[in-house]
Amino acid sequence: MARREEETKEFEERVVTINRVAKVVKGGRRFRFTALVVVGDKNGRVGFGTGKAQEVPEAIKKAVEAAKKDLVVVPRVEGTTPHTITGRYGSGSVFMKPAAPGTGVIAGGPVRAVLELAGITDILSKSLGSNTPINMVRATINGLQNLKNAEDVAKLRGKSVEELYN
């Protein structure tokens, strides 16, 4: 029991969407619920998951478990991203640009949830193409996964960080 309480304190969860879906059978419709949840520690780790169940709380619980299994580490520089990036998934894309301290998170709906739970405090973003919540979340995660900090770039080029900036 103590371990479960510890886990819930480690990550903050945010329900992005809950959708009622129907399966048409001979006797009528059978309804189920799908939940899209984003979890993060506001310190560079974020993930998302989907869950489906007969009841909403059960769907959310399944989505949270799925999200915790699929976490991404996000490089951050003073509360923002190291560089501009566009994340793509399907026909949806999310453009993210670093912002000056004090700007805040300028993002809509699902993108805002991912960025805030990743611990990013200042960023400008624009969603383009598909505005389906799951595609927007996946495009945002894709962009965050493709971010590289100065140390990674220096290592790839076989140089020191100082040589990059000269």
From Swiss-Prot:
One annotated GO biological process: translation
Pfam families referenced in this protein's UniProt entry, alphabetically: Ribosomal_S5 (PF00333), Ribosomal_S5_C (PF03719)
GO molecular function list: rRNA binding; structural constituent of ribosome
Keywords: Ribonucleoprotein, Ribosomal protein, RNA-binding, rRNA-binding
Residues in S5 DRBM domain copies: 11-74
Transmembrane segments: none
Domain of life: Bacteria
InterPro entries named in the record: Ribosomal_Su5_D2-typ_SF, Ribosomal_uS5, Ribosomal_uS5_bac-type, Ribosomal_uS5_C, Ribosomal_uS5_N, Ribosomal_uS5_N_CS, Ribsml_uS5_D2-typ_fold_subgr
One GO cellular component, as annotated: small ribosomal subunit
Functional description taken from the UniProt entry: With S4 and S12 plays an important role in translational accuracy.
HAMAP family for the chain: Ribosomal_uS5_B (MF_01307_B)
Family: Belongs to the universal ribosomal protein uS5 family.
Entry's free-text remark on domains: The N-terminal domain interacts with the head of the 30S subunit; the C-terminal domain interacts with the body and contacts protein S4. The interaction surface between S4 and S5 is involved in control of translational fidelity.
NCBIfam families (alphabetical): rpsE_bact
Oligomeric and partner information: Part of the 30S ribosomal subunit. Contacts proteins S4 and S8.
Protein name: Small ribosomal subunit protein uS5
Species per Swiss-Prot/TrEMBL record: Staphylococcus haemolyticus (strain JCSC1435)
